[in-house]
Amino acid sequence: MMERVPQPVREMLALLRESGHAPYLVGGCVRDLLRGAEPDDYDMTSDARPEEVMALFGADAHPTGLVHGTVTLVRGGLAVEHTTERCDGAYRDSRHPESVRFTSSIEEDLARRDFTVNAIALSPEGTLVDPFGGREDLSAGVLRCVGDPARRFAEDALRILRLLRFASVLGFSVEENTTRAARERRDGLRAIAHERVYAELNKLLCGENVTAVLLEYPDILGVVLPEILPCVGFDQRNPHHCYDVWEHTARTVGAVPPTRVLRWTMLLHDLGKPKCFTQDANGIGHFYGHTAASAEMAEEIMARLRFEHALAQGVRAQLACFDEMFPPERAAVHRMMARYGRETMWNLLQTKLADNAAKAPDGLEQAQKPWREALLLYDELLAENACCSLAELRIGGG
């Protein structure tokens, strides 16, 4: 397994080993290596104190969290966090321990981690240290807290969102006691900085198992996104919808490609429905004005979570054109591409397909057919490099 670790990381481990320390790779990189996946980044630990790491690696070492024992090592274009093996003191701010005690025990260090699948260490020789059954849970596809789950979530409430994120991205189930503790401790999420919440939601929404997570845990997600709660169980009372507002929403999120613009657009697109609900004389439900109401609520959420400008603009653009209707004809598709641009138009077609896929199964094929045809026409125009806007015309020299 170590042969899959990048050479610069192996060199760092070797230098620590040659200097008399006992280094290990830890956390998500070990989990991903065991899954056969490519790690996004690498973290390591050893008994070396921060000042020893700084001296050993010289210009490659950067003090990014000395109080908690963390030094970032940069070599060969890779940044690796080295955190000295430690035990954590009490948590007062639901994020950082008030004190840490450095140790020379890898088992003690692993005991402070969040989930068993993240509490496995890998030595430079390829030996695994797994005191909490992480490999077994990894094989079974189970997320379980290390030790007492209530304590883990009390230490850092963001771990609750991390739990949901891993369930979404990895497609794992959550062990019963861990689920119960996450629900009992969910109010702790109110104290978490919006930036940290936003970072976790971005990853959660782009997971392959996102629909199941949204349907299973709206009570937890509703702490950080209270706007979703009125949608849960809201009967649309409309023959075109067999799902309540929240289930429809959750299904649309999972039905679009996993880009942040599309996933956020679908999460937000129907938030205004409950406040716009009316029934006609036949008892049929209608939601007049819900698109504008949803867009307004989306603006509040994006401001609160401090979306970066480009993502906010992208979501805003998709919500603005969400209700566009046009026939699956070449001229109409070309006209829409000219109006919105290629990217927004492609996204619009994806939202149309997802929105219809999450309505009544009866007539689904009929509802999808024109949008599939429009997407084929879009692809044809794109392949022909058809001019779609005046700006493109000027660039092309026409």
Could you say what each language-model-derived stretch is?
Residues 1-398:
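Catalytic cores of the polymerase beta-like nucleotidyltransferase superfamily
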